[in-house]
């Protein structure tokens, strides 16, 4: 059993048990899990199917989001110099992952294939909306690498 309270997802966050030294190990582990989930999702073993993609990505990204949300909440309401340092150290890593997730051309191609498949017409409304949002919010990597002409 993991003793890091940021890695315990069976109940509400145990805010009082969370210390600054828990942040980096938890976020690093959850980022590794989320990165691995992304690689699995875009690989050949996961069909271009909403449920298949969701099964691979949702758990990992939800766990990361839940842990990071807890850290962010504590940073807002019970900040200490140590927690602020842990938050500031991990913020770029979490941001970089979400940027990569939203700009991954391989994932975008899978989502486009899902949207183009006949099964997408049978998706429940919330899933159709989530799929439409994923396609709408995709940002090509080239947006981040081009220098603005000023």
Annotated model-derived regions:
Residues 1-150:
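Zn2+-dependent metallopeptidase catalytic domains
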């Amino acid at each position: 059993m993991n003793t890091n309270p940021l890695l315990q997802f069976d109940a509400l966050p145990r805010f009082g048990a969370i210390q600054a030294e828990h942040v980096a190990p938890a976020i690093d582990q959850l980022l590794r899990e989320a990165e691995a989930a992304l690689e699995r999702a875009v690989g050949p073993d996961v069909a271009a199917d909403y449920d298949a993609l969701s099964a691979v990505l949702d758990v990992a990204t939800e766990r990361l989001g839940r842990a990071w949300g807890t850290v962010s909440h504590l940073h807002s309401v019970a900040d200490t110099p140590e927690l602020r340092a842990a938050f500031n150290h991990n913020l770029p890593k979490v941001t970089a992952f979400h940027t990569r997730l939203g700009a991954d051309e391989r994932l975008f191609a899978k989502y486009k294939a899902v949207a183009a498949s006949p099964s997408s017409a049978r998706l429940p409304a919330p899933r159709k909306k989530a799929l439409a949002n994923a396609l709408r919010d995709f940002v090509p990597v080239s947006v981040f690498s081009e220098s603005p002409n000023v």
